[in-house]
């Protein structure tokens, strides 16, 4: 069953958290859920080059809080925070309420090559550039190993290298325990549009196990990490709507 069910949905409340954190009545719940979906689609479409791996949405009364986990926070923030204002106005336009209070937090992803969504996005970009899929997968595995992940599985489906018959190819390095509930599995999917059709990409990243004492297994740092030692991840918190 662990190989069939969605890894994130299986571990909600254990090692994973909900992407939308709010409560609503049964009447307003569908509208708010669709609103969250529109916000996420708008952000990924407009800021596709910012490397946004996750969008967390929280609601408090009439205030909307959006947290963006990105590999390139400078693209979102812009000069003197101008990008935040553009993003806020875009979200207000998407929800159809220009008076809605929108608070935006931008958090930099600490290890880019250990993030499943960013790895899937990298693979999709390479495949769209007509790079051979085996070479692309090998390069993605090497990047993830340098980032210090404990296990990785990549699956690509479709007309690989322009073949007449679609097929599925996958590779796995290290441990990817899908049946272990305490295992922190980062899972993401992506679609690559090529001249031969679309290719489906799935990425599983095993980052460690959450132990019973709420401490997490240490992940060894690669011998050649991409990030410089001692550099702290950036975080930008929007407080312009407060007061």
Curated annotation (Swiss-Prot):
Which keywords does UniProt give here? Ribonucleoprotein, Ribosomal protein, RNA-binding, rRNA-binding
InterPro entries in UniProt = KH_dom, KH_dom-like_a/b, KH_dom_type_2, KH_sf_prok-type, Ribosomal_S3_C_sf, Ribosomal_uS3_bac-typ, Ribosomal_uS3_C, Ribosomal_uS3_CS
Query: Is the keyword Ribonucleoprotein in the record?
Result: yes
* GO BP field: translation
Q: Which SMART domains match?
A: KH
Family listed: Belongs to the universal ribosomal protein uS3 family.
Kindly state the subunit structure of this protein. Part of the 30S ribosomal subunit. Forms a tight complex with proteins S10 and S14.
Q: What does this protein do?
A: Binds the lower part of the 30S subunit head. Binds mRNA in the 70S ribosome, positioning it for translation.
Could you identify this protein by its name? Small ribosomal subunit protein uS3
């Amino acid at each position: 069953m662990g190989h069939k069910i969605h890894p994130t949905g299986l571990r909600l409340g254990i090692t994973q958290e909900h992407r939308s954190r709010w409560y609503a009545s049964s009447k307003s719940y569908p509208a708010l859920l669709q609103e969250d979906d529109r916000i996420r689609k708008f952000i990924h479409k407009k800021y596709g080059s910012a490397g946004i791996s996750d969008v967390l949405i929280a609601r408090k009364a009439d205030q909307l809080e959006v947290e963006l986990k990105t590999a390139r926070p400078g693209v979102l923030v812009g000069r003197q925070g101008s990008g935040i204002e553009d993003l806020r106005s875009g979200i207000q336009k998407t929800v159809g309420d220009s008076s809605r209070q929108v608070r935006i937090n931008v958090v930099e992803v600490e290890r880019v090559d250990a993030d499943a969504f960013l790895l899937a996005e990298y693979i999709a970009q390479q495949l769209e550039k007509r790079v051979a899929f085996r070479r692309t997968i090998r390069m993605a595995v090497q990047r993830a190993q340098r980032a210090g992940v404990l296990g990785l599985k990549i699956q690509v489906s479709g007309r690989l290298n322009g073949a007449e018959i679609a097929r599925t190819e996958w590779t796995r390095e290290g441990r990817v325990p899908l049946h272990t509930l305490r295992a922190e599995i980062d899972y993401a999917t992506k679609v690559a549009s090529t001249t031969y059709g679309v290719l489906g990409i799935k990425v599983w990243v095993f980052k460690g196990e959450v132990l019973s004492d709420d401490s997490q297994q240490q992940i060894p740092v690669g011998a050649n990490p991409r990030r410089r030692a001692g550099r702290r991840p950036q975080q930008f918190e929007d407080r312009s709507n407060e007061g």
